[in-house]
Amino acid sequence: MAVQQNRKTRAKRGMRRSHDALTTAALTVDQTSGEIHRRHHVTADGFYRGKKVIA
């Protein structure tokens, strides 16, 4: 098995973890119903960009 030769420093650990942060989902308000939904996704009642797309 692979075993590290030397211990990694706190700085190297932090550099590795610098890309691990989670981002919040981008939310927007629907033009028709005023409902909050994720960007580029259909609302729960079937509207997308102000138009009914799911009957």
Swiss-Prot record:
GO terms for cellular component: large ribosomal subunit. GO terms for biological process: translation. One of its GO terms (molecular function) is structural constituent of ribosome. It comes from the Bacteria. It holds the Pfam family Ribosomal_L32p. Keywords: Ribonucleoprotein, Ribosomal protein. Belongs to the bacterial ribosomal protein bL32 family. This is Large ribosomal subunit protein bL32. It comes from Aeromonas hydrophila subsp. hydrophila (strain ATCC 7966 / DSM 30187 / BCRC 13018 / CCUG 14551 / JCM 1027 / KCTC 2358 / NCIMB 9240 / NCTC 8049).
